[in-house]
């Protein structure tokens, strides 16, 4: 497969310009106007942020993309699917309220918001996964599959299970219905290290399945109830919750790539990633820790695999922020440095597996040419 082209622009803005101007210029340079959108429904997949989290992308960026689509005669809408876990996005009504409270509405974004898998997260379509090894079919939000054109607008950040979240995670995990998310997470279930557990009960508060109780002030997981979503792993500040299946995160990564294939295959698709506010964990948390790396810039491509690879490469070249989760880990006496910012921030991740699987099944290539736009 030939190299894909990834376009990049940094966040420097001379007086009289703005980041929104640069985003539009980036999208145009990357070829978004080559897509015939006239009279067609355009799904713009993004994350509206959990209430309390402030690292998610601002609605202004969504409006910039929606405006480009409308200029081309498209009928854009913002979309995401419901979550497995507790919080403010587990059904469509709460999800829409969350989006509004975080600034996403028809005025701020210039388009409608549709929750992709409906009221309860059950409005899904079973879609074949071309070349799928782990998933022969994927359960994708109905509204997302109904769209003629698919665009992803992603915030690049760290992630406690997948290493980082970029385009492929936004597409693969994000477009899965609640059952689809469960299918991806089913590779392994967490365990408790009782020697480290403080009995703080934070993991139980994050569990959407009521699977965690306490015996003698130590967490206990009911595996009949546990869905394997991994929220408890990210919730624990003491590393008491872990995944005993060393291959579980890798399988999750590979399933996620196959779900992304199901979403993109057979229709025009285009992808944008903003590498800023690079928090160590997912925007699904009701908080965001300090960034582990400095802001880098905006990337766009027709190839989500090359796009994520380019974003990851840029992050790996960046200097860690000292006062961050990554910086603290690197300064710990005896810390085993992986020379990999994502693994040094969250040691149990296997992020390269997502890119490897996505390339293997033909979604894109990890080989790319980077073109900088001023």
Positions of the model-derived regions?
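Extended, low-polarity segments enriched in aliphatic/aromatic residues
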Residues: 2-53, 57-61, 71-80, 85-374
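Terminal amphipathic helices with adjacent charged low-complexity linkers/tails
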Residues: 66-67
């Amino acid at each position: 497969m030939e190299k894909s082209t990834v376009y990049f622009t940094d966040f420097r803005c001379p007086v009289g310009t703005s980041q929104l101007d640069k985003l539009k210029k980036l999208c145009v340079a990357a070829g978004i106007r080559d897509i015939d959108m006239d009279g067609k429904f355009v799904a713009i997949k993004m994350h509206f942020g959990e209430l309390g989290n402030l690292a998610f992308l601002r609605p202004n960026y969504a409006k910039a993309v929606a405006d480009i689509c409308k200029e081309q005669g498209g009928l854009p809408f913002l979309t995401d699917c419901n979550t497995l876990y507790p919080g403010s996005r587990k059904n469509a009504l709460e999800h829409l309220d969350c989006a509004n409270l975080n600034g996403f509405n028809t005025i701020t974004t210039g388009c409608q918001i549709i929750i992709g898998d409906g009221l309860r997260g059950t409005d899904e379509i079973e879609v074949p996964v071309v070349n799928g090894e782990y998933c022969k079919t994927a359960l994708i939000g109905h509204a997302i599959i109904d769209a003629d054109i698919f665009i992803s607008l992603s915030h690049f950040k760290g992630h406690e299970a997948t290493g980082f979240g970029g385009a492929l995670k936004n597409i693969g995990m994000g477009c899965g219905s609640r059952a689809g998310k469960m299918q991806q997470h089913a590779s392994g279930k967490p365990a408790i290290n009782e020697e480290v557990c403080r009995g703080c009960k934070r993991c139980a508060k994050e569990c959407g399945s009521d699977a965690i109780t306490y015996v003698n002030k130590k967490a206990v997981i009911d595996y009949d109830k546990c869905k394997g979503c991994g929220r408890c792993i990210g919730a624990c500040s003491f590393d008491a919750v872990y995944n005993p299946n060393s291959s579980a995160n890798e399988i999750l990564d590979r399933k996620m790539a196959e779900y992304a294939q199901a979403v993109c295959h057979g229709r025009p698709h285009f992808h944008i990633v903003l590498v800023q506010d690079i928090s160590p964990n997912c925007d699904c948390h009701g908080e965001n820790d300090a960034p582990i790396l400095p802001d880098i810039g905006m990337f766009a491509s027709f190839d989500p695999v090359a796009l994520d690879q380019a974003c990851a490469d840029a992050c790996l070249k960046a200097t860690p922020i000292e006062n961050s989760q990554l910086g603290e880990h690197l300064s710990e006496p005896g810390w085993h440095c992986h020379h990999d910012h994502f693994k040094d921030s969250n040691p149990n991740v296997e992020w390269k597996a997502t890119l490897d699987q996505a390339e293997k099944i033909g979604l894109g290539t990890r080989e790319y040419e980077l073109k900088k736009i001023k």
